[in-house]
Amino acid sequence: MTQKLAVVLFNLGGPDGPDAVRPFLFNLFRDPAIIGAPALIRYPLAALISTTREKSAKANYAIMGGGSPLLPETEKQARALEAALALAMPGVEAKCFIAMRYWHPLTDETARQVAAFAPDQVVLLPLYPQFSTTTTGSSLKAWKKTYKGSGVQTTVGCYPTEGGLIEAHARMIRESWEKAGSPTNIRLLFSAHGLPEKVILAGDPYQKQVEATAAAVAAHLPPQIEWTVCYQSRVGPLKWIGPSTDDEIRRAGGEDKGVMITPIAFVSEHVETLVELDHEYAELAEEVGAAPYLRVSALGTAPEFIDGLAKAVRDSVGKAPGTVSSACGWRCGADWSKCPCREGASA
């Protein structure tokens, strides 16, 4: 009898049109992983923020045609992963499902689809290489609340230094650099979405894992490429982790250097890459004289990346029910209390 395997791919989600922008923002800011206030405060605050930010957010999405490309990009990854699993796991009927956190297909919708598939095994695979309570943690909590179907469940908690991920990043960076003529007056910026510093101080391993990803990729690059890690998309009054991407662009301009920027935590093109990197930061680079300004694409369906995901799924199958494991053997120290793969953590 053919085993049925459901692979659930988690990501942020994005509005599919102008009318979806405000409800998407409301769903985002009412998440306790994003705003930690009690519900009586959080819900009105989410309504206020989504209303006040709607106009500017719509303008950003208008640059991309009115909506986010994240779902179609993720669907391409799902189909590519299914094809890779068909080769890697003959005799297994593997089907990929997409669960978005803040817009359709929402977690509860996907949970019903997976239950109807009646799988023997369910592998939860967040499309966030680096674990954070604000992304992977939030998605897994929502799944646990909603899924009532069959199947032994295991989770790929993180994969910050997984070989396929690293190889794909390194290849794409090298290709962009060589296409530009292998410039030496350039600094590579590994740009990741930032977080409030208090999230990291509370034991979230995200920053540590982002920096590990960058270091692993840099080890596969020509030694003359100078690099640094920086963080983008800061909002609100809280202190965020740094340095910020815009400050690093200004620093490069002040040193008469160009920048080559690569999204190191985003695996798909969406508003933070197609608008923030391609428009806002490109304009900033021009203003401060950081030339050339090069942007490396997100991983998308890079073969090395997809093969790495397939290996992560294959390795997760057969583990004890409820196991949360790292696809690259990552093990946070005991001080990183929010990491499900930390030393001393139970499955």
Curated annotation (Swiss-Prot):
Cofactor: how bound: Binds 1 [2Fe-2S] cluster.
Biological processes annotated in GO: heme biosynthetic process
Binding sites annotated in the UniProt record for Fe cation: H193, E272
EC number(s) on file: 4.98.1.1
Signal sequence range: none
Catalytic activity: heme b + 2 H(+) = protoporphyrin IX + Fe(2+)
GO function term, MF aspect, one: 2 iron, 2 sulfur cluster binding
Subcellular location, record wording: Cytoplasm
Keyword Iron-sulfur included in the entry's annotation: yes
Keyword annotations from UniProtKB, A to Z: 2Fe-2S, Cytoplasm, Heme biosynthesis, Iron, Iron-sulfur, Lyase, Metal-binding, Porphyrin biosynthesis
Principal EC category: lyase
Pfam families membership: Ferrochelatase
Annotated [2Fe-2S] cluster binding sites: C158, C332, C339, C341
PANTHER family referenced in this protein's UniProt entry, alphabetically: FERROCHELATASE, FERROCHELATASE, MITOCHONDRIAL
Matches recorded under NCBIfam families: hemH (TIGR00109)
Quaternary context: Homodimer.
UniProt name for this protein: Ferrochelatase
